[in-house]
Amino acid sequence: MNAEHCKAYTLLQEQQIDDIHAHGYLLRHNKSGARVLLLENEDDNKVFNIAFRTPPADSTGVAHILEHSVLCGSREFPLKDPFVELVKGSLNTFLNAMTYPDKTMYPVASTNDADFQNLMHVYMDAVFYPNIYKHDEIFRQEGWSYHLESEDGPLTYNGVVYNEMKGAFSSADDVLERETFNTLFPDTPYGVESGGDPSCIPNLTYENFLNFHQTYYHPSNSYIYLYGNMDMEEKLAWMDEKYLSHFNAKEVKSEIPYQKPFAETLDIVHEYPVLDGDPLENNAYLSYNMVIGSGLDVKLNVAFSVLEYALLDAPGAPVKQALLDAHIGKDVYGSYEDGILQPFFSIVAKNADENEKEKFLSIIRGTLEDIVKNGMDQKAIEAGINYFEFRFREADFSSFPKGLMYGIDVFDCWLYDENKPFAYLQQLAIYDELKKLAKEGYFENLIQTYLLDNTHASIVTLIPKTGLAAENDAKTAEKLQKYKESLSKEEIEKIIADTKELAAYQEEEESEEALETIPLLKRSDIKRESIKLYNDEHEVDGTTVLHHNVFTNGIGYLSLLFDTKNVPNDLIPYMGVLKSVLGYVDTEHYTYGELFNEINAQTGGINCGLQVFRIPENDDDCRRMFGIRAKFLYDKLDFVMKMIEEILNTSRLDDEKRLHEIISSMKSGLQNRLSSAGNATAVMRAASYYSPMSNFQDRIAGIGFYQLLKDLDENFDEKKVELIKNLQTLMKYIFRKENLTVSYTADETGYAPLEEKIAAFKENLYTDEVEPGSIVYDFEQKNEAFQTSGQVQYVALCGNFEREGYDYTGALRILRVMLSYDYLWINIRVKGGAYGCGGAFGRGGNACISSYRDPNVGRTLEVYRGIGDYVRNFEADERQMTKYIIGTISELDVPMNPSAKGQTSESAWFNGITEADFQQERDQILDATLDDIHALADLVDAALKQNNICVVGSEAAIQKEKELFKNVENL
C-alpha cells in the first residue's frame, strides 16, 4: 500500500512487524478524526473490526444493549435483523459483536472478497445509522420491557440482554469476577457492570440508550482495524467516501481514567446463591486481588502471565501447593486479567472455609516472601516463558481467524494510548529479554513490588446462601406487583397494548424489498470441491500410523491413540479420572511439578484426553479412544517419546494425597462447565438415554461423571483403595501395542524419524494378561431436570432419525442453519427472550435441539415440537434458498491451520468418512431444492417424537413445570 495515495488520511506510523509477518500502518481520517490501523500481509482470511471506547457510567447495561441493538436494522439495510440475514447467507469466517468493560467491537472476517466488502458495508451502516431512533421496539426486545398479556396476568420483565445477564449473574465465578472489579476500581467505569446487572437493567430509559449512541458512536471515538491480503487503498477510499467524510471531527470524552491507588487493602464479604441441600460449610470463595501497573507496559504484562503460570497454574506451583497442603480450599487457581487499562492478579481458593481468610492471606504472603528470599524455581520460569512464547509463535487460535485475535490484542494498548497500537504484536524480543532477566532477580522484584508491597488490592470473600436466587426472584416479583398495583386501568392497558405491539413487530414478515438490500453471492460463487484429507497410511510392525503430510512450520503434532474396547464396564467412568491424573502425579524421575515444567520448558505440551468416534457399520456401539497428544519442534521428538514413556511406565498412581487434590480440582472445574455450558450438558444427557456416543461421553465427562467425582471427593477415604486399583488396572487394559494407532501431523522432514521411535516405544507398553471386558450402555429414557442456583434454563430435546428409517443428507446442514437463525431464533430468542438456541443433526442420526439462557421451559419444548410443521410449510424462492446454502457452506469452509488439518483428517479416518463422503454432502447442499427441505419434515418429527428431554436450570422454573420430568434433582 502507498499511504501517499490516501489523501483523506494522515499516515502517523508505518512499520514492519516481523513477529506476525505483517506490515503495519497507523492513520487518522482527516475530516472525521477516525483512527485506522492496517495490518497488510498474505493472509486471505481478511478481518475488519470497528470498535468504540464505551465507558459505562452505571450497571444498566447500556453498552451491551446497544451492541445488540445496532445490528437490528439500519438506514441502508432496514430489516429487523440484518445480522441474522448475514449469518444465513454470508461466507463469513467470523461474524459477531462483543461488549467489554471499556469498549464495544464489531468484527467480521471472510476469505471471499465480495463477501468481505458486504460485511464491512452492513457493519459500518449499523454502527453509524442504526434504526434504534425509528423503532423503540428494538430497545424493548433486546434490552428490557414490561411484559403483560392480560389485566389479571403477572407483570414481568423480558428482553434478550436482561435474560442473558440473569444467566451470567447466576454463576458464583461470575459473581466473584464482578465483585473483584467493583472493589478494585470503585471510581472508574470498571467498577460497574458494562454487560448490565439484571437488577439495574430496568432502570435504563430509551432516552439514555439513544444518548449513549449519540455520544460514543462517532468516528472521532472509533478505532477501525483491517487485516489481511486486500487492496487497502481501495478499502480506505470506500470508507472515506461512504461514511467517514460525512462526519466532522469532535471531542468525545471517553478516556478511561486510572483508579487512584488505595492506602490500604479493601476487604468485603458478598453472598452467592446455592440450592437447598447444597453444603454451606467449606463452600466459600476466598480471593486476593492486586492491581498490576498499567496495561501499557507490555513487558510487565507478559511477565505476569508467566508468573501466574509459575506461582499458581502449573501443578505443584508454590502458592497453589502451599494453600492445598494447608487445606485452604479444595481447588486453588490464579487469574491474570489483562485487556484493560489496569490489569489485576487474583489468587482464589474455592470450596474454602470463610473463617480461614487470615490463614489464606498469611500462607500467600509467607510463600511469596520465601520465594523473594530464596529465589524463584528457574525451571518453572523457563517453562512459563517457553509456554507463552510457543503459543505466540504457533498462533493457533482454533477456529478463530488469526487476524481477529491480533485485532483484539492491539486494543490492549491502542485504546489507552493511540500512539502504541503495535505494542502487543511484538513479543518475541520480550521473551528473549525475560529469559535473561529471570537470572537477575527480575521476577522476585515483581513479586515484592506488586504482590507483597501493593495496597491497591482487595480481599473478596463469597459465602453461600441457601434460597438467595428465590429471594431475588421474589423481590423482583413483589416490586413488579407493587408497581402494577400503583398503575391506573389506562396505564395497565397501555402495557398490555405495548406487549402486543412488540409481539406484532416481531411477527411482521420482512418485505422482499428489505431482504434484497442485503447483498448476496450466487451459488456459482461457491467452489464445488470439498475439503482435502491428509491421511497417508503406514504400517509399523502391525500398528497403523497416519501421516498427515502438511506444512507445519517445523512443529510436529503427535497423537498416540489407544482403543479402549476391552475395558470392563465398571472401569469406564474411571478413564475420565485417568486422563486427568497422567502427567499430574510423580513419576520415577520427576515430582509432578518438575515433570510438568520439564515438558513445558521443551515443548508445547503433552496432554491426555478421551475421544469417541462412530462405527458406521454398527450404530449400537462406538469407538472409544484414549489419546496422548503432544506438540513440539521436530528436534524434540526424542524428548517427547521419552517423557510419554516416563508417564505411562512410572506414574505414581498410589499417591493418595495427590489423587484427592486432583479429584477435588476436577469436580470444581466440571461443576462450573456443566452449569455455564448448560445447553451442551443438557444435550449430552438427553442423548445419553439412547446414543452410545453420548452415553459414553456422559459417563466420562458429563453429569454421570460429575456424580462419580462428587462421590469420590466426599468419600475419598473409603473409596481411595478401589480408586487406585481401578486406575492401575486401566493402565494394563489401555496401554498395549495391539490397541495403538498413531496420528502425526508434520511434513516429510518431521515424519522421517517417527517410525523408528514408534517401534521402540511399543516394546515398553503393557503385556500383562487381562480378561477382555466390554461396555454396557445403560439406555433409559430418564427425562430429567437438574436444578442449579441460576435464574435461567437450558432446554434440550433429542432423538435419532436413523432408528426411524431415515438417512443422513447434506440438506440437514441447511436445516440446522434455518432453525438456528429463523424458526428457533424468532420463536425462542426474539419472542421468548432466550439468549441462544440451535439445532444439530449428525451422521449417526442424532437430532438435538437446545436453548441457552432461556427464561422458559414448557413454552420452549412446544416450539421445538413445531419444527416439523415449520419445515413442511417452509417456502423460499431461489434467492432465499441460495442464502441458506451460502450460510451452510460458510460453516463448512472454515480456514484450517496445520493442526486443524491434521485433526480433521484423523477424525474422518476414525469415523470412516472419506473425501467422497464429504463431497457428496457438499453436493447435496449446493444442489438442494425446496423439495429436499420439505422431505426432512417427517424425519424431524420422527426423531423429536422420541421425546428425550433434559433441562438444566433454576429451581423455581423447573418446579413450576415438574410434571414434564420423570426425575428432578440438584446439580
Tell me what each language-model feature is:
Residues 40-42, 49-51, 162, 166-170, ...:
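His/Glu-based metal-binding/catalytic segments typifying zinc-dependent metallopeptidases
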Residues 1-47:
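Non-catalytic terminal extensions that flank enzyme cores
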Residues 211, 223, 232-251, 374, ...:
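Extended, regular secondary-structure scaffolds
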Residues 62, 66-70, 578:
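Active-site His/Glu-centered metal-binding helix of metallohydrolases
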Residues 446, 454, 710-724, 728-734:
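Aromatic-residue-lined binding/catalytic grooves and analogous aromatic/hydrophobic interfacial grooves
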Residues 150-221, 225-243, 247-275, 280-282, ...:
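Hydrophobic, small-residue-rich alpha-helical packing segments that form membrane-like cores
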Residues 158, 210-242, 702, 723-758:
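Non-catalytic, conformational "gating/processing" segments within enzyme and secreted inhibitor domains
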Residues 45-55, 81-129, 136-147, 174-199, ...:
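M16 family metallopeptidases and their MPP-like homologs
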